[in-house]
Amino acid sequence: MAKQTPLYDQHVACGARMVDFHGWMMPLHYGSQIDEHHFVRQDAGMFDVSHMTIVDLHGNRTREFLRYLLANDVAKLTQPGKALYTGMLNESGGVIDDLIVYFLSEDYFRLVVNSATRDKDLAWISQHAEPYQVEVTVRDDLALIAVQGPQAQQKVATLLTTEQQQAIAGMKPFFGIQTGDLFIATTGYTGEAGYEIALPKQQVVAFWQQLLAAGVKPAGLGARDTLRLEAGMNLYGQEMDEKTSPLAANMGWTVAWQPEDRQFIGRAALERQRMKGTEQLVGLIMTEKGVLRNELPVYFFDAAGNQHVGVITSGSFSPTLGFSIALARVPTGIGEHAVVQIRNREMPVRVTKPGFVRAGKAIVL
């Protein structure tokens, strides 16, 4: 039977259509996915992301452990609260998961990992933590709400104490701080400003209701997906998985090659892939009528006149732009134009970098 977050009854009360999402009953939408999408882009929306897993790591060798476990390098994290985005790879260079890691103190780091990969992530982390004597604590006592949009931070501030407001004042992106019972982080999955807030489960219903009263609109998985697609953000299981290299998933920037003597899981395989070359993740725009969908083939000719085929990993109508967009994995050599096969029609598409909207503004037109 699917699990419920502590906010399940609140979703039902708000008129949500609930669906099974990787073993969790989650809101798909609360009536209009499009309206929820626009509200996040233009004002402030909130998402229940309590199905995600928060993992605390304690021990004197935690930093050393994470420098081995993760493709990005936590040596970059020198200021308490600073976070980074990274892949956690297997020995063949495939992506076990993508996650955020926070440096809280020299013997205390926090990971936030995906719900769909929870069991395998925890097994992998625990297995590799043991030689480093790192204590792995799953924080199932916490709930998680993402509040996103241009008015998100302002509306959240109205619910905080003076001390909490001062604690987060001027906090840059990709930081997290514990203030009172709230862990407030300037992270998100929408391309908008906002916070992801972890708090004790027994307090989350009251906090949700306070956010509602402050004019923050609930948004479901549907809007979350179109928002992250517009922002060019990957979804695990679509843009990458255990058989996909981060180099083929627009995650090359998250691989810390320096220093050269840092050994991390998957490094040797990635170095071979880097030498040989991999496929690449690109953006697609289709202004003609129709919708780009996952798994549709993408055809193009390279400079030598040879035809190649790729595949759409995520595609949808873009509510912000008013036409269809997609992320696609394609062989190298693609130019600015390609064709997508939709039923019996070959539809022309424009090839862009993977990212279409940031801070409410189009970045591809």
Swiss-Prot record:
Any one GO CC term of the record: glycine cleavage complex
Superkingdom of origin organism: Bacteria
GO MF entry, a single one: aminomethyltransferase activity
SUPFAM superfamilies associated with the record: Aminomethyltransferase beta-barrel domain (SSF101790), Folate-binding domain (SSF103025)
EC number: 2.1.2.10
NCBIfam families named in the record: gcvT, PRK00389.1
Protein name as it appears in the record: Aminomethyltransferase
Native source organism of the sequence: Yersinia pseudotuberculosis serotype O:3 (strain YPIII)
